[in-house]
Amino acid sequence: EIVSLSLSLLAVVPLVVLVIAGPLNVRGGTPSQQCNTGTPQCCQQVQQTSDLQQFRSSFGLVDALAGASALVGANCNPVSVLGTGNGAQCNTQPVCCTSNQMLGAVNMGCMPLNVNA
């Protein structure tokens, strides 16, 4: 009787271990070279909206940017995440923008994209 109990436990224990281990969910933030929304952008100019008085008036955006506190990118192009193709070389800080374009040249709500991590 003890032998059959031992064999039963020997058969059940591996199944219990498999159920407990189960599939592993990889958790964490967005990889550093990706954006939560939109695609990575390389803009010719990236500045805080609070520093853009001249930029605002030249694009006629005084009212639109008056209360904003995010980064604004001008003349942005998509960046290839793998470092190849159009926009692979970015002379300014790559950014993720919320794709709120104004006048086709200004991207609002941008955040720096860390490509070194």
From Swiss-Prot:
<feature type="disulfide bond">
    <location>
        <begin position="97"/>
        <end position="110"/>
    </location>
</feature>
<dbReference type="InterPro" id="IPR001338">
    <property type="entry name" value="Hydrophobin"/>
</dbReference>
<comment type="function">
    <text>Aerial growth, conidiation, and dispersal of filamentous fungi in the environment rely upon a capability of their secreting small amphipathic proteins called hydrophobins (HPBs) with low sequence identity. Class I can self-assemble into an outermost layer of rodlet bundles on aerial cell surfaces, conferring cellular hydrophobicity that supports fungal growth, development and dispersal; whereas Class II form highly ordered films at water-air interfaces through intermolecular interactions but contribute nothing to the rodlet structure.</text>
</comment>
<keyword id="KW-0964">Secreted</keyword>
<keyword id="KW-0732">Signal</keyword>
<feature type="disulfide bond">
    <location>
        <begin position="43"/>
        <end position="76"/>
    </location>
</feature>
<dbReference type="Pfam" id="PF01185">
    <property type="entry name" value="Hydrophobin"/>
</dbReference>
<keyword id="KW-0134">Cell wall</keyword>
<protein>
    <recommendedName>
        <fullName>Class I hydrophobin 2</fullName>
    </recommendedName>
</protein>
<dbReference type="GO" id="GO:0005576">
    <property type="term" value="C:extracellular region"/>
</dbReference>
<feature type="disulfide bond">
    <location>
        <begin position="35"/>
        <end position="96"/>
    </location>
</feature>
<dbReference type="GO" id="GO:0009277">
    <property type="term" value="C:fungal-type cell wall"/>
</dbReference>
<comment type="similarity">
    <text>Belongs to the fungal hydrophobin family.</text>
</comment>
<dbReference type="GO" id="GO:0005199">
    <property type="term" value="F:structural constituent of cell wall"/>
</dbReference>
<dbReference type="InterPro" id="IPR019778">
    <property type="entry name" value="Hydrophobin_CS"/>
</dbReference>
<feature type="signal peptide">
    <location>
        <begin position="1"/>
        <end position="21"/>
    </location>
</feature>
<comment type="subunit">
    <text>Self-assembles to form functional amyloid fibrils called rodlets. Self-assembly into fibrillar rodlets occurs spontaneously at hydrophobic:hydrophilic interfaces and the rodlets further associate laterally to form amphipathic monolayers.</text>
</comment>
<keyword id="KW-1015">Disulfide bond</keyword>
<feature type="disulfide bond">
    <location>
        <begin position="42"/>
        <end position="90"/>
    </location>
</feature>
